[in-house]
Amino acid sequence: MYEQRRDSSMDFPSRNQGKAGDSSGRRLQTRRRVASPGHNPPPVSVQHYENFPVASWLCPPALRPAVRAIYWFARTADDIADEGDTPAATRQALLADYRVDLAKAATGEPASARWRGVFEPLAEAIRAHALPVPLLSALLDAFEEDTRHAGYADRAALLDYCSRSASPIGRLLLHLHGLHDARLQRQSDAVCSALQLINFWQDLSIDLPRGRDYVPRSDAAAHATTTAQCLRAPRADASRALVRDLCAWARELMLEGAPIAPAVPGRVGWELRFVVQGGLRILAKIESMNFASFARRPRLHAVDHLLIGLRALTMRPSLPQPARIA
């Protein structure tokens, strides 16, 4: 469900990658652009946005236009929120304008020329599938928070962010597949949040030097350290112990949501199997590095992808099969 990065790692819900191009790991960004006036997104498969759970070959053809529309909505907002050296106030103003166009799309009014290529398809998707607009609005809340990024005091604060930056995507895709069961929604939230956390913990060596600190301060304090100290001594016992605890948290959350994968029938269920096993495999790779994520980023290789596939194929409702080191 979540695409693989071009650097042989995995794409999960995060604010860390997702644009086409390089292998640096930081959102695969070369230099991303806010959609220009009259911008018309090309009909690509949904394979570049980090918060997007999609493997296009598993997406039913009838749903692909709506999935693309949601993708371009999220990707363009992501571009605005993380537009290089643009002042935060400017990005916030652009996101406010973007939110106005979302409201217009929801009511069938014409969007502004600037993002017409984004909102015309989205308006059609909203109309055709009765997309829950509050979920789209929640994504914008998260992007606005990104422009004010000041870190997170504790796990509850970070999970609150995930509830707006990651969980809405899972719920939108469940909605498109006609899945509205509350239990499935809770499990989807757990999987999406877990994937977001996994991406944070695999990208510590990349994000922190760029001013993006997602480590809850309470977790760092519990190990009598700070993220700045961990960057200076990435292989110190406290640094590794901190990553170990963070990965255990992400794994627990993933296993909480994992039963959704074998429980959901059809293509989306198979997609979810790969999502769950991919996330667990990344955690296993971090463990194989002795939790040295402050020093470097884990990478998946061909054997890892084979293991992900095998474990996805053999998942059972009562056996999520956590991906341990082979």
Question: Which residues does each PLM region occupy?
Answer:
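Catalytic cores of Mg2+-dependent Asp-rich isoprenoid enzymes
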Residues: Q4, T30-L195, W201-A326
